[in-house]
Amino acid sequence: MVLFHSQASCCKRVKADAIVLPFWQVQDKVRCAASIVEEYEPLYQVALENFAGKTGEAELIYSYGQGKEKRILLLGLGKNEELSSQDVLEAYAKATRILRKAKCTTVNIVLPVISELRISAEDFLSNLTSGILSLNYNYPKYTKECQSSEPLLTKVTVLGIVPKIADRIFRKEESIFEGVYLTRDLVNGNADEVTPQKLANIAKGLAKEFPSVDAKILNKDAILKEKMGLLAAVAKGSAVDPCFIVLSYQGKPKSKDHTVLIGKGVTFDSGGLDLKPGKAMLTMKEDMAGAATALGILSGVAALELPVNVTAIIPATENAIDGASYKMGDVYIGMSGLSVEIGSTDAEGRLILADAITYALKYCKPTRIIDFATLTGAMVVSLGESVAGFFSNNDVLAQDLSEASAETGEALWRLPLVEKYDKALQSDIADMKNIGSNRAGAITAALFLRRFLEDQPVAWAHLDIAGTAYREKDEDPYPKYASGFGVRCLIYYIEKFLSK
């Protein structure tokens, strides 16, 4: 994907469908933040009568043939002294939404005067690029026409920046968003198409694309041989075989530092015998968003050739129903040897993650484990669609993730591992139950996973992305449906804190 181009001079720009001009809000007035594109000044001066320049405010007007573009988009950036990176991202995401609705495919963007910016030019450009890329995406529709009524942007030329500086940022963000789009495509895809085997094939494809990536796929027989009794139990009711995916990237082979990403890969969740209501099942193709996130992150890390070692582990299965489905009240033994009494077959995600954690500890020698899962409805109730809750046994890891969250705008909120709630997982007939009481569900789910670390000195974080992975409405800077949430944040974390 090469969408972005750059040019130092506005005067020599090529023709385009639209030009985007930035504006500052200065007390009660509005001022163009860029070096004036003179031919358009009379036109936009008229439009400024009803334009305040607030952050994200936008107005699209016609140029009436007076320049090289057919339309002019006035884009408010608010007050310069208050400008944040997230403001930039959201403003240009909104601009993208407006331009696509107007069927503009080629766009010239004039940067503000660099010396006036409160944030660095690199930061501004990076977030501008991310904002545009985030909404330059189409949900894979299954209509007869198979075409979106809003065409994608095909060429974006950023004016007022030295190409040598800009192009490096563009290529980096484009590589990251290849991972975001991969995540979105997998989450948005039909559950009958995005099966465990499909996820395995995606992993194999990444191994072919990147020389430093290797894929290992365990089939049903290999899963049983490894005594992954929890993953095997969840898979019992499905006509589709499970698989266990191990995708390894070696960017620094001599280093012992090793990050393991674990993604919940339930490709469709009926709830099992503890059947979900029909309405709750409508979006359950998204229950493999953790797996898709792990694949998207590893894709981005490999594309950027970061000097780190990262392994993505994906336990993949459906949670379906037939006469062989695993049953409530029964006890199953995981790869760790720990036994679990099934209090609900709809608490299946933590079961397959438990076997994945055990596998990582046995074979991968991880420095840290970070898991991603659409795990609990309790998290959606607590934090909604805009914030993902996370838990960690390590303050340094938690702080670094929080900083990455703040820098990328993908909001994470650390929640406590309340020790006394662990008692809710006690069982009279097994080492533990897979559900606690009807309270603090997100916390008890995290405490369940922590048990499988078995006191090993491994930093661990659990991200419950149940609310953020799939959105019911458009809200800048995310499209409706799959968001790709977490990919940018974790790539930033890996690059900043681990690429040393």
From Swiss-Prot:
PROSITE patterns: CYTOSOL_AP
Protein name: Probable cytosol aminopeptidase
Cellular component per GO, a single term: cytoplasm
GO MF: manganese ion binding; metalloaminopeptidase activity
Keywords: Aminopeptidase, Cytoplasm, Hydrolase, Manganese, Metal-binding, Protease
Cofactor: Mn(2+)
Compartments, as annotated in UniProt: Cytoplasm
Binding site for Mn(2+) 2: 264, 269, 287, 348
Catalytic residues (positions): 276, 350
